[in-house]
Amino acid sequence: MKSFLKYTLATITGIIIASILFLIVLIASLSAIVSSGNKPVSISNNSILVLKAGVPIPDRGDQNPLSGIDIVNMTLNPAPGLNEILHNIEKAGADNKIKGILIENGLLPAGWATTEEIREALLKFRENGKFVISYSDYVLTQECYYLATAADKIYINPSSMLEFKGLSSEVMFYKKALEKIGVEVQVTRHGKFKGAVEPFILDKLSDENRSQIKDYAGSIWNQVVADISKSRNIPAEQLNRLADNLDGTLASKALETNLVDGLIYHDALVDTLKTLSGIKKEKDLNLISMTKYDKVPDPKMTVSGKNKIAVVYASGTIVDGKGNETNIGGNYYADVISKARLDTSVRAIVLRVNSPGGNAIASDIMWRELDLAAKAKPLVISMGNYAASGGYFISAPGTKIYADPMTISGSIGAFGLIPNLNKLLEQKLGLTTDIVNTNKNSDFPSVFRPMNPYEKELMQMSVENIYTEFVNKVASGRKMSPEAVDNIGQGRVWSGTSALKIGLVDEIGGLKDAITAAAKLAGVETFIVKELPVFEDPYTRIISQLSGEVKMSILKKELGESVKYYNMIQELKSMTGIQTRLPYFIDIH
């Protein structure tokens, strides 16, 4: 027996030691890969920069040290962010070693505003006398085609297809599904256009929501058509006819209607690139990825100096507390903005907003620090794909607001949402709860019972108060009357183009324009761009990332298919309380 215990304990000890050693080796290996990825590189003459469409493009390059790691080849290939893509395109325009840009097109889950910014950068790149070629082997989606029209020539595979059909918005409604699993969503709201709650309480779009979606989708489409018309020299009326009839779907029809310039295979593309680069042998063709080119030093980049422009990236849903890299923690970002305000070397702040909104109190906490910052130094707002509801709330104090023509903005409104999980827990899962209160409403708000009339009235009052505050703060920031803001508010969503017309933004432009404006307002000509927030060190983040993956793996294993209910409940829990949030479920494609 003693011998058995001895060997058992030895085995367990060995497993523990081996696991610890494996973890140490794994972390060391990952750290080595991350460190090696930061070394500067050089490129040869006649190089071609490759813009590979096919992965999501965040406003800021992925700060996750595990992102893009190829364990087999021990390399780091993170997806570049919009900031890196724009900088690389501008840098390549002045780089004598770069002959042109190849857009490897296909799927582009980037958002219309992001795509438009990249497209404008490509058009400016061409002004340097360099070429831009777009090629797609498979289906060229509509968003990708819009990007491709910035190129000198558009080529697609003879067997591929092109998507050109106009915009569509599909909204999924959860009401019946929630009823089936026993979840009741209790809603209060202000704003007849506040459509964020509709998927939980309706089976289809309200007339007001349908109208606003049609308006802002129409505004975006008109911009797309106008830009393509200018680049391809095709009248807008003809483009709309092509979209109505799906005439450009087949490759042969796309060529016939001048939507593309040629139907070629990849070997012919290589020949084209060789000719444009002035080389004879394919082995001398030097294609450079965005990730690699980002490590090429920029001779024009200021590396030192006393003047800084802080660019604060605020992407994702606004939540309370610290948040994480996929959302905006109100308290954390307030602290980041406060430090930028107090830093005398920071001459101006640019807030890059790409958010559908979120928690009302978290938005207000951020607003306060942004308002203080705007009183201390220039605060310029740059709006990405979304800057709506809470996203617009935090933009309101801006000295100057820039939006893309295709930005989804506005949505000045508020709503409250509390799920009642009583039936789900009791009837579906067999769980019951009992409550002991010291006072009448001690357990409010509770997800285990429905609200009583008094609580509903209290929630509505809270929503009304938040809406009034929202309107007043926008009125103050935009130098408008509260009545004027209310007229364009009520939860209504606007495109960037429309927002400019009604005074919600000052200029149409992208992130680069906002940074330039901030420097001008601050009276500085040379400056360093300081990107914020600065996240925790790679070693801490690697461990955190690994633990997060383990947690989700365990949940999936234990819950199986029921993990979808867990995810749904987590989403509902995050929306508990008063929200200033866009109906982000809406996808325009």
Can you describe what each PLM-predicted range is?
Residues 241, 353-358, 386, 412, ...:
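Acidic/histidine-enriched alpha-helical segments
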Residues 300, 304-309, 313-340, 344-345, ...:
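Intrinsic disorder and flexible/low-complexity segments
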Residues 175-274, 422-502, 506-508, 512-517, ...:
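Charged, glycine-interspersed solvent-exposed loop segments at helix/strand-loop junctions
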Residues 230-231, 261-305, 415, 471-477, ...:
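C-terminal long alpha-helix characteristic of the crotonase
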Residues 42-45, 301-306, 427, 523, ...:
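Extracellular/periplasmic catalytic domains that process cell-envelope and extracellular macromolecules
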Residues 2-42, 46:
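N-terminal type II signal-anchor transmembrane helix
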Residues 361-365, 498-501, 543-545:
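Short glycine/threonine-rich loop-to-helix capping motif typified by GTGT followed
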Residues 40, 49-171, 300-424, 464:
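Cleft-lining beta-strand/loop regions that shape enzyme active-site pockets
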